[in-house]
Amino acid sequence: MAKDIKFDIQARNGIKRGVDALANAVKVTLGPKGRNVIISKSFGAPTVTKDGVTVAKEIELEDPLENMGAQMVKEVASKTNDLAGDGTTTATVLAQAIVQEGLKNVAAGANPMDLKRGIDKAVEALTADLAKQTKEVGDSSEKIKQVASISANNDDMIGDLIAQAFGKVGKEGVITVEEAKGTETHVDVVEGMQFDRGYLSPYFVTNSEKMTADLEDPYILLFDKKISSMKDLLPVLEPVAQSGKPLLIIAEDVDGEALATLVVNKLRGSLKIAAVKAPGFGDRRKAMLEDIAILTGGTVISEERGFSLENATIDMLGTAEKVAIDKDNTTVVNGAGDDKAIKERVNQIKAQIESTTSDYDREKLQERLAKLAGGVAVLYVGAASEVEMKEKKDRVDDALHATRAAVEEGIVAGGGVALIRAQVVLSKIKTENPDEATGVKIVSKAIESPLRTIVENAGGEGSVVINKVLEGKKDFGYDAKTETYVDMLKAGIIDPKKVTRVALENAASVAGMILTTECALTDIPEDNAGGGGMPQGMGGGMPGMM
């Protein structure tokens, strides 16, 4: 396909228009008084959301050059969402601010490579300062509630429920979000286990919207070797198929003819089935398979124990109320194992934790213990309508990710204040040349943008508030909800440090790429206007027939 080639200012301006189009749509959602965005769908009701990444993912622009800019900033939002689970709007706002300031300087003759080096140095210094500002969350359910409430758009009820869920399953437990049958939102704790292995083929997916394979009341086959041949599996498959129940296969690997046949049977609908790799490696894999066997009331089919796959019977299979599998994880809920056997296994792992001298082994044993004893907390989100349910579920997902990030890396003052406080370290950075120093100044100005946007969305004047916050010390900041100046930590306006850090790093990374772009290639659309007509000679005599 032919390419349209744009250079220099023409390329950068086109990309900037795309960046602005996407960022302006996303940033209206930032802060306690941020607004909703309504997204039209080709079928069904429109989606109403206040989640930055949901808005970003829907945006495709007509102009190919502008669309390139939009897609690059979309990458900032989705990468931040993948790593931190929240902070997507902050990341987008930061990226737009760095691009805006940077392009002004490039147009004025600054060297883009030096600017990028300055930007990278500034981000490194800010990240180090954020680490100094961080306070640990520990087991404080009050702090967990505050982080969750803010991330759920100041919804205290969601904050309470997430704090409750963390209280029940602990940091190591697994928390999932489901749609409730009624209008009530509540937390249920279900005994269960999650491990980090996803489905072996996307053809096993049963829910194409979420890309998950959900098996209700399945049999679970546990095998410690690779399965390549279908004939080994047939003795077990036949009675399972007759029972009409789904089957989950957990083995070292399933490949070749065996995997192909399972996929074909799943697609034909003759067998509800999914296969995942066994978690862990070596001896740890054997131990984890045994954990799953005890939890589900099954037996690990292992040649070491004298069992072989072709002689396996349906009695050796475990069962569970439900198994949910996505591309990365498998969650087994309400395994049918014997409570006494599970308790004995838990005590055995606790004894191993006490006797081990290796920190790594201790960590892995604690993970296994949490999976056996911690259980799964399910947050059921209820609402009066489907549209409200989806919007609320998005907020609960955000809040949950933010809370995990806070538990992992601690918290800093929220509302954009942590970045403003970190600004002072930028004046101490040693730079090689004036353009590098300009790169540092670009970041210094850009990190004011989250607070500025929060204030403007609340109807205030950004510059006035920023100056007032700069005059204050430590956690002094602006509460846009009440439009007053407060101590952010005492007022419970806090952000996970991980979210702020990841947003800043991703924004600077993509903005740096845009600033150092000198040439953009886009496809020239082919003109298909004459493509489908008749050959010329055929149409010539038609008018005379009238």
From Swiss-Prot:
Name the PROSITE patterns for this protein. CHAPERONINS_CPN60
Documented EC number(s): 5.6.1.7
The entry's keywords: ATP-binding, Chaperone, Cytoplasm, Isomerase, Nucleotide-binding
| Gene Ontology biological process terms in this record | protein refolding
Q: Does the keyword Aminoacyl-tRNA synthetase apply?
A: no
Which EC class heads this enzyme's classification? isomerase
Location within or outside the cell? Cytoplasm
Q: Spell out the InterPro entries in the cross-references.
A: Chaperonin_Cpn60_CS, Cpn60/GroEL, Cpn60/GroEL/TCP-1, GroEL-like_apical_dom_sf, GROEL-like_equatorial_sf, TCP-1-like_intermed_sf
Q: Short name of one Pfam family for this protein?
A: Cpn60_TCP1
Q: Where is this region: Disordered?
A: 526-546
Q: What is its main location?
A: cytoplasm
Give the CC-aspect GO terms. cytoplasm
Q: What protein family is recorded?
A: Belongs to the chaperonin (HSP60) family.
Q: How does it assemble?
A: Forms a cylinder of 14 subunits composed of two heptameric rings stacked back-to-back. Interacts with the co-chaperonin GroES.
Q: What is this protein called?
A: Chaperonin GroEL
